[in-house]
Regions:
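Short alpha-helical segments enriched in small residues
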Residues: 1-152
Length: 152
């Protein structure tokens, strides 16, 4: 699955999509935004790399571990509301090369939010930092495509 399939489904269903990024620092929005027709359905994204931005802009609870399923979910809910999207996906985790606060490199969480549901996926990725980021973007696009396909 790639951005072309996501674009086709989102456009056909007249969906509006948004992303919140911590780990991927804009790579996901870039991948989506470079696709044909994205301006019709891609609302945009928020890069919330620092914890303060997560809290202040997207309403993430400041007491949570930034590398957690709950933060991933809150990021998705926050950006969906902020950008008035039908569905949203968020990325957070540790890209490496070193671990962070007890989390190993490659521990990644994708959060998602629609009008009716919120959830997350945990990924355990291996490789160099650029490989972990690329795999995270691919997984996020796949998740968005699946959410769009299932959207009623």
């Amino acid at each position: 699955m790639g951005t072309a399939e996501l674009s086709e489904i989102a456009a056909a269903k007249d969906l509006q999509v948004a992303v919140a990024e911590s780990l991927t620092a804009g790579l996901l929005a870039s991948a989506i935004g470079s696709g044909a027709g994205a301006r019709e359905w891609f609302r945009g994204g928020v890069v919330a790399y620092q914890t303060g931005v997560k809290n202040e802009v997207l309403g993430v609870d400041e007491h949570l571990d930034p590398c957690s399923p709950e933060v991933a979910r809150q990021l998705a809910v926050g950006v969906r509301g902020l950008l008035r999207a039908d569905l949203a996906v968020a990325t957070t985790g540790v890209g490496g090369p070193e671990g962070d606060d007890g989390h190993p490199p490659g521990e990644v969480y994708l959060g998602w939010a629609t009008a009716d549901a919120v959830g997350h996926r945990r990924l355990e990725l291996e490789g160099e930092p650029h490989e972990i980021l690329a795999a995270t973007v691919d997984a996020a696009v796949e998740l968005l495509t699946s959410l769009a396909a299932d959207h009623e």
